[in-house]
């Protein structure tokens, strides 16, 4: 199975705005790149053939290339638009399956990615990995790549489940603590730092 990954990343100057109370813009940009340096190696370490990082930011695309991923300049606006652009490129390059996930998963490891692939089994399917609150979607594996529309955002776990049921797509839920934890708020950052799970020490606001 030729599995491609698509990782959307916002422009650095606007990244992680919810952390503005505790991190200055340089700190937020640095944290975003730090997490990308975790996500891409996790994907490559699990043996994915191709990793596409989609972003409007040239600095992000350059970092992606340094990590061994392909950089795709985002033309549209928003998370789901970035994922659609990545899906189109993946299909052009012959992807048999697509793994979509955000870049703000600071604990993800190759074993987590491998678990998603294992749960998929054989044949057409959708594997959904929710966030801690079981509200959002933190990873979505689709085989074939066009099996479902992308609906990432608040409440997307349920939206993706319902879309799979409506379309008759076999669906599996894969809950992994390292995938469920995404870094969005000051509380998330404090939790991560307290756990010792991040070595990066960003500049404070």
Swiss-Prot record:
Its EC number is 2.7.7.105. SUPFAM superfamilies: Nucleotide-diphospho-sugar transferases (SSF53448). Pathway: Cofactor biosynthesis; coenzyme F420 biosynthesis. Disulfide bonds: none annotated. Keywords: GTP-binding, Nucleotide-binding, Nucleotidyltransferase, Transferase. InterPro entries: CofC, Nucleotide-diphossugar_trans. Gene3D superfamilies: Spore Coat Polysaccharide Biosynthesis Protein SpsA, Chain A. The keyword Translocase does not apply. It is an enzyme of class 2 (transferase). The keyword Nucleotidyltransferase applies. Belongs to the CofC family. Guanylyltransferase that catalyzes the activation of phosphoenolpyruvate (PEP) as enolpyruvoyl-2-diphospho-5'-guanosine, via the condensation of PEP with GTP. It is involved in the biosynthesis of coenzyme F420, a hydride carrier cofactor. PANTHER family: 2-PHOSPHO-L-LACTATE GUANYLYLTRANSFERASE (PTHR40392:SF1). This is Phosphoenolpyruvate guanylyltransferase. It comes from Rubrobacter xylanophilus (strain DSM 9941 / JCM 11954 / NBRC 16129 / PRD-1). The lineage of its organism: Bacteria, Bacillati, Actinomycetota, Rubrobacteria, Rubrobacterales.
């Amino acid at each position: 199975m030729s599995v491609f990954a698509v990782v959307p990343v916002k422009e650095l100057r606007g990244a992680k705005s919810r952390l503005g109370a505790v991190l200055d813009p340089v700190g937020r940009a640095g944290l975003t790149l730090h997490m990308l340096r975790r996500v891409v190696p996790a994907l490559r370490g699990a043996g994915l053939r191709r990793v596409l990082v989609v972003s409007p930011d040239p600095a992000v695309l350059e970092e992606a290339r340094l990590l061994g991923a392909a950089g795709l300049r985002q033309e549209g606006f928003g998370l789901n638009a970035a994922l659609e652009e990545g899906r189109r490129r993946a299909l052009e390059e012959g992807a048999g399956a697509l793994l979509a996930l955000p870049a703000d998963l600071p604990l993800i490891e190759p074993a987590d990615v491998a678990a998603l692939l294992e749960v998929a089994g054989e044949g057409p399917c959708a594997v959904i990995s929710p966030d801690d609150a079981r509200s959002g979607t933190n990873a979505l594996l689709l085989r074939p790549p066009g099996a479902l529309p992308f609906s990432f955002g608040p409440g997307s776990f349920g939206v993706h489940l319902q879309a799979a049921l409506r379309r008759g797509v076999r669906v599996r839920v894969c809950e992994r603590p390292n995938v469920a934890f995404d870094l969005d708020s000051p509380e998330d950052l404090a939790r991560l730092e307290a756990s010792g799970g991040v070595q990066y020490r960003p500049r404070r606001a």
